[in-house]
Amino acid sequence: MDQDAFILKEDSEVEREAPGGRESLSDVIGFLDAVLSSEPTDIGGDRSWLHNTINTPQGPGSAHRAKSEGEGEVSTPSTQDNRSGEESRVSGRTSKPEAEAHAGNLDKQNIHRAFGGRTGTNSVSQDLGDGGDSGILENPPNERGYPRSGIEDENREMAAHPDKRGEDQAEGLPEEVRGGTSLPDEGEGGASNNGRSMEPGSSHSARVTGVLVIPSPELEEAVLRRNKRRPTNSGSKPLTPATVPGTRSPPLNRYNSTGSPPGKPPSTQDEHINSGDTPAVRVKDRKPPIGTRSVSDCPANGRPIHPGLETDSTKKGHRREHIIYERDGYIVDESWCNPVCSRIRVIPRRELCVCKTCPKVCKLCRDDIQCMRPDPFCREIFRS
């Protein structure tokens, strides 16, 4: 609203200063009278006269002369003058906001450049309206609006002058890594990477490396001698011929491990352990003693014998079997003898001799008074 009031005020001042201000006002009034007096049918009529060339006003009083000649007629030059006045005023009103908007844009540019000059380190001061400014900044900001750094300037310079990198490499100068610091040269100890590799060079010299990689024959012999002195299986038990696969145990003689042949002093335990010829673990002699014979697997009655823990063919006699149970609140222990050659049953019962060599009565069952069951074996025992 203030802007419109300002424009209307300026229009009134211009009309006062202009010599033909009253004529333009009268032209507007005449144009409005013509529009209001026209009939509705004339609206859809020929309006080609709107596109005619606008002629300059012939002079003051032209509209009055046309009106005096004919009361109901409106001259064409007056309407053209009215249109020209309206267009000039409209153009003048539209040009003023454009000028103000242009001035506002210039102020924003000045503020932006002033802010860039305070934040950027390489900002170039530019003057507005000097005529030589093309509108392109020498150092334009990046996408985020911040000024470019020195590293980006160097990258742009290297892209503009590709021959400079070749000159640096020819002169032996280290090439800097883009976006970082240059890698130091390691000298003789490490390979010169010149920025082409991020792996650090070795810190030791080539002479020490050669000694470690290619040892001398004397050093190899010293290492071998030292390794031979060390025990191969330290902290573990020595292997015996019985546990090592593919080896045979020494032949067993008729003397047991505790005894010694005649004419030789008895050996001690330390000799068995520390001796290099004999194994560390003594092997038990499994050979049956002289004067005993084994029982055949198929006796005369046809029942095969399965030797095991319950049967020992080297011992003849009886074995004592017990049964413990409770009767009338008392614990009863009954025992009896069975031949050694018989099998041990889960259910206690009296068994007969299988080998026909076991004695009928032994010192264990000689004092038995009563048998658990009167079987033929018990009757035979007590009968005898």
Curated annotation (Swiss-Prot):
Keywords associated with the record: Host cytoplasm, Host-virus interaction, Inhibition of host innate immune response by virus, Inhibition of host IRF3 by virus, Inhibition of host MDA5 by virus, Inhibition of host RLR pathway by virus, Interferon antiviral system evasion, Metal-binding, Phosphoprotein, Viral immunoevasion, Zinc
Superkingdom of origin: Viruses
Residue stretches of biased makeup (Basic and acidic residues): 7-20, 83-101, 150-168
Major localisation: host cell
Binding site for Zn(2+) 2: 341, 353, 355, 358
Binding site for Zn(2+) 1: 318, 337, 362, 365
Statement: the UniProt record of this protein carries the keyword Phosphoprotein: yes
GO molecular function, one term: metal ion binding
Cell location: Host cytoplasm
Similarity comment: Belongs to the paramyxoviruses V protein family.
Function: Plays an essential role in the inhibition of host immune response. Prevents the establishment of cellular antiviral state by blocking interferon-alpha/beta (IFN-alpha/beta) production and signaling pathway. Interacts with host IFIH1/MDA5 and DHX58/LGP2 to inhibit the transduction pathway involved in the activation of IFN-beta promoter, thus protecting the virus against cell antiviral state. Also interacts with and inhibits host IRF3. Blocks the type I interferon signaling pathway by disrupting the RIG-I signaling pathway.
Free-text comment about domains: The C-terminal zinc-binding domain is involved in binding to IFIH1/MDA5. This domain is also involved in viral pathogenesis.
Protein name (Swiss-Prot/TrEMBL): Protein V
Organism of provenance: Sendai virus (strain Fushimi)
Lineage of origin: Viruses, Riboviria, Orthornavirae, Negarnaviricota, Haploviricotina
